[in-house]
């Protein structure tokens, strides 16, 4: 068993102990049947499952924010200057060139501050609010660091990778919300994505600092973020993996299923016979394991899927 699988399993077991639950076994026949089945694109069938579900987990990835105009930094052309995002989002990259890493995240902050939640974000928030009045629970697990779900009104949310708008002191570890743009004067006008743009080479003393201690600040990127892999087992300590055990309906929205840890949740849920619906513009390596797959822009498919079902209580 890999370290990543072990960490996820450990968190799942921790949650189940706290809830007084036991992990149900995965039947081998169930595995085979799920793997061999083809996902359905019948929206009416999906909505019948949706109408009966009491605990709904919605997992979102870069695709849903891409429809708001946010670069995904994945796939062909997914570069900032000449760098891949994953090459910059590491402790090693930050230690070697903190100026370059801060330029990259300054660019991302500037882009996101000019964008807005789209129809998919709004539909998810409206669904959560509506179902909560019916005694049903919706939780959103997002890989995105743009806070669009929160801006759209979602309340019950786990930000697996943290936020571009929280900073952490390198010395005391405290975290603060920071929407200043630029986050420090030295980053004004920096971070251009053009491959020919020169590196700013900002002196260390001019990079973001914690006001009270004077120590350096870094973006508070959580859990499985490559920049802070040590937070995997302590940030949002139990919520996301637990949902793979107690949810009775899962939705996979605009995510490639390749990014850990979220990439493991959908298959884990599906192997326990829980209906999982994938909403994406493309199929993914695990699409065949899911009960449903809906192809198309999330801003179109999600509002339809999450709209009130005729059987819902209205009063």
Swiss-Prot record:
Record Gene3D superfamilies: SIR2/SIRT2 'Small Domain (3.30.1600.10), TPP-binding domain (3.40.50.1220)
Superkingdom: Eukaryota
Keywords: Cytoplasm, Mitochondrion, NAD, Nucleus, Transferase, Transit peptide
SUPFAM superfamilies referenced in this protein's UniProt entry, alphabetically: DHS-like NAD/FAD-binding domain
Enzyme class: transferase
Coiled-coil spans in chain: none
One Gene Ontology term from the biological process aspect of the record: protein desuccinylation
Family membership: Belongs to the sirtuin family. Class III subfamily.
Protein name (database record): NAD-dependent protein deacylase sirtuin-5, mitochondrial
Organism: Monodelphis domestica (Gray short-tailed opossum)
């Amino acid at each position: 068993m890999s370290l990543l699988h072990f960490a996820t399993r450990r968190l799942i077991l921790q949650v189940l102990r706290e809830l007084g639950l036991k992990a149900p076994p995965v039947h081998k026949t169930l595995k085979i049947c799920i793997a061999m089945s083809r996902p359905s694109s019948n929206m009416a069938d999906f909505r019948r499952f949706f109408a009966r579900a009491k605990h709904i987990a919605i997992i979102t990835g870069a695709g849903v924010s891409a429809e708001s105009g946010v670069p995904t930094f994945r796939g062909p052309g997914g570069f900032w200057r000449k760098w891949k995002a994953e090459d910059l989002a590491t402790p090693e990259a930050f230690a070697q060139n903190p100026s370059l890493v801060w330029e990259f995240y300054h660019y991302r902050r500037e882009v996101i501050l000019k964008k807005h939640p789209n129809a998919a974000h709004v539909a998810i928030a409206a669904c959560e609010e509506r179902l909560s009045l019916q005694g049903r629970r919706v939780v959103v697990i997002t890989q995105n660091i743009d806070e669009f779900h929160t801006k759209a009104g979602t309340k019950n949310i786990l930000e697996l990778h943290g936020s571009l708008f929280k900073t952490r002191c390198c010395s005391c570890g405290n975290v603060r919300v920071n929407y200043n743009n630029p986050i420090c004067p030295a980053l004004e006008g920096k971070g251009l994505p053009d491959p020919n743009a020169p590196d700013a080479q900002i002196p260390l003393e001019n990079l973001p600092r914690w006001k009270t201690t004077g120590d350096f600040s870094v973006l508070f990127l959580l859990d499985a973020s490559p920049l802070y892999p040590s937070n995997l087992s302590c940030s949002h300590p139990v919520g996301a993996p637990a949902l793979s055990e107690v949810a009775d309906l899962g939705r996979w929205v605009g995510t490639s299923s390749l990014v850990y840890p979220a990439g493991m949740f959908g298959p884990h849920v599906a192997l326990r016979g829980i209906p999982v619906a994938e909403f994406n513009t493309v199929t993914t390596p695990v699409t065949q394991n899911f009960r449903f797959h809906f192809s198309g822009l999330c801003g179109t498919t999600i509002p339809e899927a999450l709209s009130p079902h005729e059987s819902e209580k209205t009063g």
